[in-house]
Amino acid sequence: MKTLAFCSFKGGTGKTTLSLNIGSNLAQVSRKKVLLVDLDPQANLTTGLGVQIQDDHSLNEILRHSNEIRRAIHKTKIENLDIIPSSVLVEDFRGLDKDISLSVNHLHLALQKVQDQYDVCILDTPPSLGILSQEAFLASDYLVVCLTPEPFSILGLQKIKEFCSTIGNNLDILGIVFSFWDERNSTNSTYMDIIETIYEGKILSSKIRRDVTVSRSLLKESSVINAYPNSRAAKDILNLTKEIENKLFSDEKLVQETL
């Protein structure tokens, strides 16, 4: 099982939207078995898929007792796509953020028990760097950093890098993805070029442009490709999904080609 954390230093970067839609595309289009984990107490990923929140069958149970993962996993309406939902009780862990040493790596231990049942696990992290993000980063193989083309993006990337160093897990950045991209705005390219000089080769070529169908699909508790398959957003996210999939499974494809 390949495990990747979708992260950002602040809200409004499209992180949860990408977690939901890339997970959905991998399950439906690529026929991968996918597990989503909602680490945000706001539970937007959970509600976006129409999953009912149950405090005793959720991420809360795993963070307190890592041996309870199987009853915390819920099926979604999408074939091959399961989710570990968040709940309001997960908010309690934010109170421990000032002492990140208190984390005991429950999520990593729990996911090891189901690693043979899934091809990909996507962790949707909260827009802050504390214990919940630490749990996600320690359980992950890769990071997908979600940014918007603005000055604070550069600062956010540096904060994420410092956080990884603090917790002793220098994760490989699988890719940096830009949401709310406007190719007509020259400042978008300016910020991207600055980040490219610092993180050479890490910016993914697929950009997610503004599209109202993204928010409309969430109101329908659906992925974009299901609700609006011909939309610009569906095309952008599908291209991004293929790019991420190629990076995740490139070694396996290389082995198959040589056989």
Curated annotation (Swiss-Prot):
Signal peptide annotation: none
Residues given in the record as ATP binding sites: F9, K10, G11, G12, T13, G14, K15, T16
InterPro entries recorded for this chain?
AAA_dom (IPR025669), DNA_Partitioning_ATPase (IPR050678), P-loop_NTPase (IPR027417)
Q: Which SUPFAM superfamilies match?
A: P-loop containing nucleoside triphosphate hydrolases (SSF52540)
Q: Please provide, alphabetically and separated by semicolons, the GO molecular function terms listed in this UniProt record.
A: ATP binding
What keywords are annotated for this sequence in UniProt? ATP-binding, Nucleotide-binding, Plasmid
Q: Which residues cross the membrane?
A: none
- Family according to the record: Belongs to the ParA family.
Name used for this protein in its record:
Virulence plasmid ParA family protein pGP5-D
Q: Which organism is it from?
A: Chlamydia psittaci
